């Protein structure tokens, strides 16, 4: 497994571990603000992982498709991807400044 895949898998396993902890918190009737804080942390981890996966897709598959003259096809694919997760573009300074 290459470095990119290791990073993504590790981040997902970390998020899963946090979710398991949140489940225990709910089962033990923990204080709601503490649960919300942990949920927010997991959401942040998943959003960061989503951005990393999207960036990898841009740097590999999209760049390759553009070089191969399949720009229209890849634009359609990207539009479809963004339809499901618009947050992927959030909090990226280069995009926010445009």
Q: Predicted segments — roles?
A:
Residues 1-98:
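Solvent-exposed interaction patches of small proteins and small membrane subunits
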């Amino acid at each position: 497994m290459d470095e990119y895949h290791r990073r993504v898998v590790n981040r997902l396993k970390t998020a899963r571990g946090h979710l398991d902890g949140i489940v225990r918190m709910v089962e033990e009737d923990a204080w709601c603000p503490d649960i919300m804080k942990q949920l927010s942390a997991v959401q942040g981890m998943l959003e960061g992982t989503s951005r990393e996966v999207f960036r990898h897709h841009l740097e590999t598959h999209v760049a390759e498709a553009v070089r191969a003259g399949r720009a229209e096809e890849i634009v359609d694919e990207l539009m479809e991807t963004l339809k499901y997760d618009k947050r992927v573009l959030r909090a990226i300074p280069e995009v926010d400044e445009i």
